[in-house]
Each structure stands twice: as structure tokens, then as C-alpha cells.
């Protein structure tokens, strides 16, 4: 699959195969400075389109995938196919597909935790990390309260959820980026979405503290107040654990979506720093495919 658009930065949509499953990704911009940007839970790569476009305009190549079970990638109904470590392997598989020795990797919420999984698996391939809204130790109660009812709805209410999804697919898009994200979220097939939640519930949420503390790559950690699922205390804790972490406080969960200029500038500056010559050691060796 190959689709191109010329709105702002050129965007190319491609696919690759990982462990026998087809995954979709968008590519914004071009060049050697690659940033892999990962979406949130049950969202799609389109959530990061504005940020990816802005960073591509600054000279970065931004690659935005749909993880398995999300967006336009394959969406099997088997819960065992989904876990944070598996998602981390998918990102490494994408680097292999792109023939990249190293990249900056980052994401939001689920994408933040997947980025950490990628970093602990192959630290030599991580030029830097952009971690927005990590879900760690202090988020346990908030996640249980938010996602347990959602899992029940998607599992036992699947017939009704399918009707709601069908109605959402008929709704017009284009009113706003946030509205389109919400409609995309509601219009998903509930079966695979339930499998994603089940798989994540039965696995680890993030690498354990000792593994996080071993990450040496520079990391920009973005947190915000008043969010029980992504408590600011988790972002603060992560920065204290990491060897080279920097904390950036957002005004709210919506700042990067509705008033993105400040945070986009900070992220762009961080990416520029990550790619300064001779700031890391010798060239890395790409992992063998398969």
C-alpha cells in the first residue's frame, strides 16, 4: 500500500510485515534524522499527524506506525498477540524494515511505555526518547477505574458496541483533529480492541524500575497535572530514575493537541540535540531481521 498527500509536509503511507502480520506506517519528511512516534492506547497513527508535520518541517524524518490491533494495521482477536514487550518488538521490527541503525523513539501514554520497552531491549539503537504521559507505578488505580469498565463494555457489550461503531463510521470528519480522533476511537471493531486490553492487563505495564534506570539515552519526559491515568508523579519519578532525563511540564493533556507551539518547539529542540554530531559513541550494528 502506498498513498501520498501534499498537505503541508509530504506524507507517504506504507506497510511492512512483522511476525506474519501487516503493519501500517506513515512517513513525514525525509533525511537521516529519524523519529519514530507512537500513538496512544486504542488510537491510531493519525493522532500524531499535526506534530509529525511540524517536526518534518524542521528537517526531521518522522515515522508514525499503527501498532498491531490499532488503526489500519491488522487487528487479530487473540489476546496473546498483545503486550508491551511485543509492541516494543514491533518498533524494533520497523527499524529493521527501514534499515536504521538508530533512531529517536517516542510516544504518548501507551506509546511512551512502548518506547521504554524498545530502549531496554536494544539500547544501542536509541538515539533519544520522547516520553509523553508515561503510565507507571502511580497510575494503577486510575487505570483500573478507567479501563476495567471499558473492557467489560467491549467484551460483554460487543453487539451494542458494534452498532455504536457503525454509527460513528457514518459521521462526517473534518470538524477538528480532536473530533476526528474521537470518532476514529469509537468506530473501531470492539472485538480486537477488547483483545488489546486483555493482553495488556495480563502483561507488564512497563519495564521494571531496574531496567528503566539502566537506560542511558537522553530522554525528554512530558507530564501534566490533574490526570489520574497519567499522573505527573509518574513523569517526575521516571526522570529521577533515568540517567539523562529532562522533565517538561505541560499545562494539561490538551496543550500539545490544542496549543501545540510551545511543546512542539521543545520537542524539536530536543530532537536537534539528539542528532548533534559526535554526541554518542561509535556506530551501532543493526539487529538481524527475523
Region spans (language model):
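Flexible "cap/lid" loop of the alpha/beta hydrolase fold
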Residues: 116, 120-121, 127-156
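Catalytic active-site module of serine/aspartate enzymes centered on a nucleophile-bearing elbow/loop
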Residues: 244-290
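Active-site loop/oxyanion-hole signature of alpha/beta-hydrolase fold enzymes
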Residues: 57, 64-106
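Conserved HGGG/HGGXW glycine-rich cap/lid loop of the alpha/beta-hydrolase fold
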Residues: 21-74
Amino acid at each position: 500500500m502506498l498513498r501520498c498527500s501534499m498537505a503541508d509536509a509530504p506524507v507517504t503511507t506504507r506497510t511492512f510485515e512483522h511476525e506474519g502480520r501487516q503493519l501500517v506506517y506513515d512517513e513525514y519528511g525525509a533525511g537521516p534524522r529519524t523519529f519514530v512516534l507512537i500513538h496512544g492506547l486504542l488510537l491510531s497513527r493519525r493522532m500524531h499527524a499535526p506534530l509529525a508535520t511540524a517536526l518534518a518541517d524542521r528537517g526531521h524524518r518522522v515515522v508514525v506506525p499503527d501498532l498491531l490491533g490499532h488503526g489500519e494495521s491488522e487487528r487479530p482477536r487473540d489476546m496473546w498477540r498483545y503486550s508491551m514487550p511485543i509492541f516494543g518488538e514491533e518498533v524494533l521490527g520497523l527499524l529493521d524494515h527501514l534499515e536504521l541503525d538508530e533512531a529517536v523513539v517516542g510516544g504518548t501514554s501507551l506509546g511512551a511505555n512502548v518506547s521504554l520497552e524498545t530502549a531496554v531491549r536494544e539500547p544501542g539503537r536509541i538515539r533519544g526518547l520522547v516520553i509523553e504521559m508515561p503510565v507507571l507505578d502511580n497510575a494503577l488505580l486510575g487505570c483500573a477505574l478507567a479501563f476495567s469498565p471499558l473492557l467489560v463494555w467491549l467484551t460483554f457489550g460487543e453487539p451494542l458496541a458494534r452498532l455504536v461503531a457503525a454509527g460513528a463510521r457514518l459521521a462526517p470528519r473534518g470538524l477538528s483533529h480532536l473530533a476526528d480522533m474521537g470518532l476514529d476511537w469509537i468506530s473501531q471493531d470492539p472485538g480486537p480492541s477488547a483483545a488489546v486490553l486483555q493482553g495488556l492487563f495480563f502483561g507488564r505495564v512497563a519495564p521494571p524500575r531496574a531496567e528503566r534506570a539502566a537506560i542511558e539515552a537522553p530522554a525528554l519526559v512530558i507530564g501534566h497535572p490533574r490526570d489520574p491515568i497519567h499522573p505527573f508523579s509518574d513523569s517526575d519519578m521516571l526522570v529521577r530514575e533515568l540517567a539523562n532525563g529532562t522533565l517538561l511540564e505541560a499545562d494539561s493533556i490538551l496543550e500539545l493537541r490544542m496549543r501545540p507551539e510551545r511543546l512542539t518547539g521543545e520537542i524539536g529542540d530536543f530532537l536537534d540535540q539528539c542528532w548533534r554530531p559526535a554526541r554518542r559513541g561509535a556506530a551501532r550494528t543493526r539487529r538481524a531481521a527475523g
